[in-house]
Amino acid sequence: MSKIFLRKGETIDETLRRFKREVAKNGVLAEARRKEHYIKPSVQRKNLQKSMRGKRR
């Protein structure tokens, strides 16, 4: 959970930029996108094997 507090003399835009950077660093959005839909374990294995084949080449 990212908590960002408004600093004295800081604009809302700067605070929002800091918040976005913090969320990206923690990987919160990436994890939410990954867990958005259920993926069966067999499909996960298939995708993993496919990506590994591409990395070996």
Curated annotation (Swiss-Prot):
Keyword Nuclease: no
Keyword Nucleotide-binding: no
Record-linked InterPro entries: Ribosomal_bS21 (IPR001911), Ribosomal_bS21_sf (IPR038380)
Pfam family, one: Ribosomal_S21
Lineage top rank: taxon: Bacteria
GO molecular function, one term: structural constituent of ribosome
GO cellular component: ribonucleoprotein complex; ribosome
Keyword list, A-Z: Ribonucleoprotein, Ribosomal protein
Gene Ontology terms describing biological process: translation
Family: Belongs to the bacterial ribosomal protein bS21 family.
Protein name, UniProt field: Small ribosomal subunit protein bS21
Organism of this sequence: Phytoplasma australiense
Lineage of the organism: Bacteria, Bacillati, Mycoplasmatota, Mollicutes, Acholeplasmatales
